[in-house]
Amino acid sequence: MPTTRTTLGAILAVATVLAAAPGLAQRPAAPAPPQQQHRVATPQNQHVRAAGLRLWYRQPAADWNQALPIGSGRLGAMVFGGVVEERIQLNEDSVWAGEVRDRINPAAREALPQVRRLIAEGRPIEAEALADTAIISIPRRLPPYQTLGDLHLAFADTAGHAAATMTDAVPAGYLRELDLDRAIAVTRVTRGATTFTRTAFASAVDGVIVVRLERAGPDPIAFTARLSRERDATVRTERHDTLLMDGEAITGTGKAGEERRTGVRFHGAVRIIADGGAVRAADGALHVTGARTATILITAATTFRETDPAAACARMIAAAAKRPVQALQAAHEADHQRLFGRVSLRIGDDLSDLPTDERLARVIAGGDDPGLAALYFQYGRYLLIASSRPGSLPANLQGRWNALLSPPWGSKYTININTQMNYWPAEVTNLGELHAPLFDLIDIARVDGRRVAREMYGARGFVLHHNTDLWGHAVPIDGARYGIWQMGGAWLSLHLWDHYDFTRDQAFLRTRAWPVMREAAEFLLDYLQEDASGRLLSGPSSSPENQYRLPNGQVATLAIGASMDAQIAHALFTRLLAAGGVLNEDAAFLDRVRAARAKLPAPAIGRHGQLQEWAEDYDEPEPGHRHISHLFALHPGTQVTPRGTPDLARAARVTLERRLANGGGHTGWSRAWIINFWARLEDAGEAHAHLRALLAKSTLPNLFDNHPPFQIDGNFGGTAGIAEMLLQSHAGEIALLPALPAAWPAGAVTGLVARGNVELDITWEAGRATRVVLRPRAGGTHIVRPPRGQAVASVDEDGRRVPALPRADGAVDIALTTGRTYVVTFR
């Protein structure tokens, strides 16, 4: 089997070799970016740059969890801000071990009906043992995402002494900050009469990371630069001013049934341009002396995209080196502001004069800081911009930032919630085009997903289980307790519908969303089995990563009819029917979908008053489990709503209360999901309490989410939860301030987006909305629900009064015309 050392398009070539195995389909070339309806910042929603939108500290990062992230989507870096030595940990999104290969367990097709039979006979323990050996993939795990390496800058003092002889004591006036508005990390160190400033940013425009070193004072800039990686790489110098690294992302032992020792080949390049000094290469490092300023250009590439990564890096470095650093920075800032500047949020007092770690410590000690919540909200948006751009890979478990060769859970795409949570804030916080990398990965994974559906399940369409990687593998991995769950593809397909629902881009719906949703539904139509009472149930499956207790006291995982499966199927079928209506698609197919939806079990209320997690009313041995999968119908689904299904909403509340009473929410991402649940239940107090808990219990000094360890999903889930507290549009209406906490009595948000492609600004005082501005990008009549206890007083269209038709429940209908501006006031 040849090693995969090819471009993304040449995944085709590797898959062609693999296709010699019966039924093994080849991978597609890199898909074109989806058609997007870009939202451009306008004078109405372009907020004034605020000094408060920064993370800042009085000391360098003591460890990786204190370093500050920058990223361009494809490239990422963690900046430590050292005094004597700067460490910049580097990532490139496709530095990934492994290869395209057939991972299907050859015994799976024959074992599947046996596993189903054992579960039906009340023998799920035996079923799990069989599935673990006969269905789980070979090898059992997927390879990891890896660090590129580290750039170390060892500074010399004014007398030219090396860093090893200098003190690393933090000097007075030290500053380390991350400016979210400009996407720039700054370190400022004063020694004697000279202040040294280091500015770092990752440019999506120019494909490079830039580090600018400047001084104010008499002493010159002097340092030694080295590249390093723990293993599987070599470093050399080129010319007098360039460091080069070549390596391969390798994992595994190469033994039979295990991962082969192969992965993408990568190349990294660093060039230093000094003004007024000298740069020389010696001992595998670059030495800068006597400089007034120095500019470091960093880039990397791999064989995932490039046939010749070294040549690609040379082109990017050469192009960037021709431009003044001021032009590189201006282009970077403009590109970042085009996205980041669309949304602003103001709540609480401005405490930005306090260091970020001190503000976090106050919250941990029991204090409240609404402004820190606003900063956290914008930090989530910043991180999505930095880790997911059209043309990059999607944000993985750690976004783009990983310092390890074998990171926790492989830093992969865990698609039983974590990857989906990464993209919850994309549409509502006006970053819809950043969804594109996820759609591209789905297209890649569909290829293996079709083969797995056909060869493992005898089904049409495509299936994904609980994990995938940059190669798009679709097999069940890790073990039966985790891997035997077939709803990953169906859940991911809902993200394409969401993008349509927020943009109303029918071309996207037809060309990108419909094919994926249809194939996901085709699999479910074949996979779901009808029981004796006529219900369509999944199985063998599981409620992600959770277990249930049998009447005899045994604990099992595999089941027939996990509630989440039915809820995801219901969501997919419902959206597919809506899409078919918009597109006037295959009526016969839609009739099958409609008939199948009618046979899905509705969410059931168990003996504790809770929503059942399985078709049977089982108890679980871990009642505070981190996954709360059976509340999918509440969030991100829409099947359960307080007004539409009040009984189910009450049962969802009981479910949350029981989980929390038993220690639930103990992981960062789980706590973030809980914020969203309470916001959907319109319980502002609980949503706010869990936002504070997320900050106090699951947030690292650099505001990264702490599972523990770091996972980025909690950051994105927290940002989405704050948005849900301020605006909801999932229930067929635009609900204003549905979960506004008393702790935020006054504030304003601009640039949020509601389904139907309506951009909104909301201002409130004394806990009551005072003014809402609607900017529709797609026309139509919308139901607008004012905040609880308020009513719409007037609606003006470009300064002219227009009618708002009242509904019996207090909401109003407003006809919106594309391109107009509507101002709503309240009483």
Please tell me what each predicted stretch does.
Residues 1-11:
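Bacterial N-terminal signal peptides that target proteins for export
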Residues 9-19:
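Bacterial N-terminal signal peptides
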Residues 23-24:
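Sec/Tat signal peptide C-region and signal peptidase I cleavage site
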Residues 27, 31-481, 498-500, 518-521, ...:
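Aromatic-residue-lined binding/catalytic grooves and analogous aromatic/hydrophobic interfacial grooves
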Residues 67-89, 94, 135, 147, ...:
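C-terminal capping/lid segments that line or modulate ligand- or cofactor-binding pockets
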Residues 215, 774-776:
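Asparagine-centered strand-capping/turn motif at beta-strand->loop junctions
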Residues 418, 485-499, 512-526, 670-673, ...:
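Extended, hydrophobic alpha-helical segments in both membrane/secreted and soluble proteins
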Residues 489-491, 496-520, 533-535, 542-549, ...:
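Active-site neighborhood of glycoside hydrolase catalytic domains
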